[in-house]
Amino acid sequence: MTMKEGEAPFVGDIVLEGSRIARIGPQLGEEADEVIHAEGMLAMPGLVNAHQHSPMSLLRGFSDDLKLMDWLNRKMLPAEARMTPEDVYWGAKLAMSEMIRSGTTAFADMYIHMNEIALAVQEAGMRASLTRGLVFLENDGGRRMREALDLAEKWHGGAEGRITVMIGPHAPYTCPPEPLREAIGLAERLKLPIHVHLAETKEEVAVLREKYGRTPTEYLHETGLFERVHVLLAHAVHLSERDIGLLAGMRGGIAHNPVSNLKLGCGIAPVSSMTGQGLVVGLGTDGAGSATTLDLFEEIKAAAWLQKLGREDPTALPALEALRMVTIGGAELLGIADKVGTLEPGKQADLLLVDLNKPHLRPVHSLESLLAYSANGADVDTTIVAGKVLMRNRRLLTLDEDEILRQASVRAARLVAGL
Ligand SMILES: CSC[C@H]1O[C@@H](n2cnc3c(O)ncnc32)[C@H](O)[C@@H]1O
Ligand SMILES: [Zn+2]
């Protein structure tokens, strides 16, 4: 399944040369140095997680069933204040083990100690867009901006081009006008995209109304942001029709995080209205500290079901559209759609083999329905990024999973002790 617009699934071969797809088509039957026989399997583009906080895998299940602000202020921020660069490194590796196992090949990450995440990405062999999250409520904003700049200088284009960097003002409610303008200015100067949370809860909308007399979207729009740079907006749950109009024509788009939104009771993002206005939508998990899973197959289902339920219309967000969101949609949000997101000659070989030899994946009336509504991450047999096999026959080849699990248990226990 190439995910190229209008191209039907076919039985065939994919020939890789180096990091790229050289040829793809029905039964090419070419000689090769190495052959993966994939009878009964389906090849598709790697999944793109368009928004998350990878080291929060260490906080999975530590604090559930709370409102967003209580969860963040009372639980996550105190645990994060204890995180060392080494904790972040091992938390990111834990997340990457889960992502590779469930077919994610690229992800957009916003967090702290980003140098350690970059090292982990380099070693794991994944593709990532990395962002130093910028919260400006305390007075060390200058140090954070310097860290964002250092990250860009050291890692943009790094790991053989698999790493790119964005500038990350965290959210309208944590970024007053002056530092927000500085962050946007930095992005413009470095020609980098912006990655920012937007309008996740009704409370956020009320806070912005009280502080600035504007919706969160109006607040960002007023800076000229959407005309100036490529923007990755995470969540965008509470947007009015007018807000959606303000985003029309933007470069970048929206990372929809349906499982996180469901679990935190945030609301249903107006995804169908956004796509109706021509906005690009991708899918993200958010951190495992809120969503508890990094399996994008869960997000595909949740995204489709939420739109169908919210609009009381089973035709809303059909299977193929959800699959396009999690592949080429995410690639567009990360600014790498020229490299990945579809299977076609010349693009990077970022792809998965999904094992269809399972009772819950038979019979094959519709591959797109099976993938969107019946498959899960454990059905992924093989994950390949830039032509390198990261998982084969469900065995991780670039990560030491036993060591990662050991490090994660010890470090997670220390982070949450007494909180
Ligand atoms: C400063 S790094 C990023 C920062 O974001 C926090 N975070 C995680 N999930 C969410 C969410 O759903 N909304 C807002 N902020 C979130 C994370 O804990 C880090 O502190
Ligand atoms: Zn987030």
PLM segments and residue spans:
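Active-site gating loops and adjacent loop-to-helix segments of metal-dependent hydrolytic enzymes
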Residues: L58-W90, S97, A124-E138, T201-H230, ...
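C-terminal cap of metal-dependent C-N hydrolases
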Residues: T2, Q348-L405
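Divalent metal-coordination and catalytic microenvironments
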Residues: I14, S19, G40, H51, ...
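Metal-coordinating catalytic core of metallo-dependent amide/deamination hydrolases
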Residues: E116-H238, R242
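N-terminal metal-binding scaffold of metallo-dependent hydrolase/deaminase domains
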Residues: M1-E31, L42
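Alpha-helical scaffold segments that flank or form the walls of functional sites
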Residues: R60-M126, E147-G158, S409-A413, A417
